């Protein structure tokens, strides 16, 4: 299990005043490690390339994941490739609260929605969406299928 901190649990409400790493999400790995320590089939992993970006392999494919508040789906592949010198096969993003799939330089960019749907802030900026998530099926060739799961 990897976690990617985002903008929803920052300590300071105004994003202009918030510092990177100052949010409650950074506590999640510590909490999960303590709570899951007796489950031998669950590992809570640390992000090694950058605190806000996870990188891991599934069936030989390189997956990178971020919350998405600092990324744009159309150029995230280029950004990650230039930052780390590794071109991902799949990029997972959230933040936009809606499911989506695009292909950028043969890399699949998958956006997952919000489990809880729209909150008060989302409504105030007219970004209303039903609760939804994605489920990815990945084999040795990459993304085989992407399920668009509606949770309403």
Which residues are covered by each model-predicted region?
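Active-site beta-strand termini and strand-to-loop segments that position acidic
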Residues: 56-59
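Core catalytic region of metal-dependent phosphoesterases/phosphodiesterases
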Residues: 1-38
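Conserved beta-sheet core of the metallophosphoesterase superfamily
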Residues: 22-26, 33-38, 45, 50, ...
């Amino acid at each position: 299990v990897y976690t990617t901190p985002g903008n929803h649990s920052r300590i300071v409400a105004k994003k202009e005043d918030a510092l990177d790493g100052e949010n409650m999400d950074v506590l999640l790995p510590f909490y999960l490690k303590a709570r899951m320590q007796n489950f031998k089939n669950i590992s809570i992993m640390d992000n090694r390339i950058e605190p806000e970006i996870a990188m891991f392999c599934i069936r030989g494919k390189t997956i990178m994941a971020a919350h998405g508040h600092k990324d744009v789906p159309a150029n995230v592949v280029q950004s990650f490739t230039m930052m780390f010198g590794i071109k991902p096969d799949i990029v997972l993003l959230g933040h936009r609260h809606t499911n989506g799939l695009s292909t950028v330089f043969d890399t699949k960019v998958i956006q997952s929605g919000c489990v809880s749907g729209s909150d008060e802030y989302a409504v105030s900026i007219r970004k209303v969406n039903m609760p939804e998530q994605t489920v990815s099926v990945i084999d040795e060739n990459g993304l085989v299928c992407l399920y668009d799961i509606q949770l309403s």
